[in-house]
Amino acid sequence: MKYSIIIPVYNRPEEISELLDSLSRLSPCGQEYEIIVVEDGSTKPCEAIVKGYEAVEPVRYLKKENAGPGPARNFGAEAAKGEWLIFLDSDTIIPAGWLCAIERSLGAVREDWKCNYAAFGGPDRASADFTPVQKAISYSMTSFLTTGGIRGGKRKITRFFPRSFNMAVRADVFREMGGFAPMRFGEDMDLSMRIVEAGYHTSLVEDAWVFHKRRTDLSKFGRQVLNSGRARIALSRRHPGSLKLVHLFPLCFVIASVLVLPFDVLFCLLVLFDSTIKQMKDGQGFPSAFAIGLMSIGASYVQLWGYGLGFVAALFSKTAVSENINNERFYN
């Protein structure tokens, strides 16, 4: 078997239903695969939903005590049979051509990379039926203006490190690395960094994109990016030298937005223009595109301020690396 698709879930049965429905519509790629759903101690189980798909796709349901998404992925990997372990978040929806894009990319790997090619990931985007807030959040998490090119996309200014919302690792390398570390945040980046540090190659597969719903409101999004800022410090302590100038951008943004009023005005106008144009290219009419553009300003401020404040908080914390993961907050 070539592919094992592993999905950790905690109290999100409705998301699993949508995700499995999308996976049931995958275009044939000529390779055998399996789907493993790992219930991480949920109080709202999705077992009945998963069992309902057993007749139409090769899905298995596993359950364990709650320990967080990293350990849940490791649990699924232990039961996996595939040569490649593909990790998806439960809040993704998969287009029909996703697995075929992965198969094509593996067939096109450079000859001098084939022995040491160990991991890849795909980008994410917003679906046309996402809410305006979800589209604004998606913009803020994928725009070059707000991320500096460190997330999935064509314009990269750092090495690509796959993230677990849409990430694949060669099974033998995953086991060699010991799987995901028991970190509170940033366990996917940590694994990607360890893979690269061990001398393996990684890449972005641009055509293997997924729809990623992310958070449904700005308060949940704020908690997520606060944790992302904390994770960056944890990663820099585990991987000395990994902290780059681009990672300081959110903190610099916070300082500039407080001290320099013209900077705020210019940034808001740039985001409004860029997001509105992007939404119109995606088929939105001008009024709705402009409304999402306005929301994108708010989402961008939440992202950059949340990340920057989390970054500073972790910088002065001794527990940024050692805190364990064990509950719902780490799926929110």
What are these regions (language model features)?
Residues 22, 36-48, 66-67, 89-95:
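A conserved acidic beta->alpha catalytic loop
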Residues 21-32:
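Short, acidic, metal-binding catalytic loop of nucleotide-sugar glycosyltransferases
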Residues 181-243:
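Catalytic donor/gating beta->alpha subdomain of glycosyltransferases that bind UDP-sugars
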